[in-house]
Regions:
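Short, small-residue-biased leader/transition segments that mark boundaries at the very start
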Residues: 1-6
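Individual transmembrane alpha-helix segments
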Residues: 9-38, 42
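Structural signature of hydrophobic alpha-helical transmembrane segments
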Residues: 25-36, 78-90
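Hydrophobic alpha-helical segments embedded in the membrane of multi-pass proteins
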Residues: 36-40, 58-66, 84-98, 112-120
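Membrane-helix interface "capping/anchor" motifs
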Residues: 46-58, 101-112
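Conserved mixed alpha/beta catalytic, RNA-binding, or beta-rich assembly cores of soluble enzyme
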Residues: 47-76
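Loop-to-transmembrane alpha-helix initiation sites
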Residues: 81-90, 111-113, 129-142
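Cytosolic-side transmembrane-helix boundaries in multi-pass membrane proteins
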Residues: 125-165
């Protein structure tokens, strides 16, 4: 509880975090968590070039926003959901790490399940775990579950028609 109160009082506002001001100076942070705006530009470019689909990044960011917002409403000691999204490696993980072709599910429904689970695990690890950044752990855990997601959310085979009832 003390850790959350201490760090919450030191967080800059969400607009400053969006453009990379993470403290008294610009760019105080590790690579990838400095400027969320630049990461969002990278997301827009990859979506425009159809390198990735929107399913994984949007589901991760939306899930983290909703659950951290509910926690903030229940107890204002928890950080503002915009500050949670724009600080740390959440954007980097959601945009560039979780969308890896090899380790992410094949179907759009599977991608949404994968993203929601990553977002939920991220919030849980960040708030109740011993690590302030749970994004990488959440991605690794869900990478292990990707074959299971692919098993239960199978893509239609080429030429397959829906079953008649």
């Amino acid at each position: 509880e003390f850790r959350r109160v201490l760090f919450r009082s030191q967080l800059p506002d969400a607009l400053s975090l969006l453009f990379g001001a993470t403290g008294d100076t610009f760019g105080a942070g590790t690579t990838g968590e400095v400027c969320a705006f630049a990461l969002l530009l990278g997301l827009a470019y990859m979506l425009w070039k159809k390198v990735i689909t929107w399913h994984i990044p949007v589901s991760i960011i939306a899930t983290v926003f909703v659950f951290s917002g509910l926690m903030h409403l229940a107890n204002p000691v928890y950080a503002n959901p915009l500050a949670v999204i724009f600080s740390g490696g959440l954007m980097l993980g959601a945009i560039f790490m979780a969308t890896d072709y090899v380790t992410s599910p094949m179907t759009h429904k599977g991608m949404l399940i994968y993203g929601v689970c990553i977002g939920l695990l991220t919030v849980i690890i960040r708030n109740w775990g011993s690590y302030p950044e749970g994004m990488s752990f959440a991605i690794l855990i869900m990478n292990a579950f990707t074959p299971l997601i692919n098993t239960y959310v199978k893509p239609k085979r080429f030429g397959e028609k829906p079953a008649k009832k």
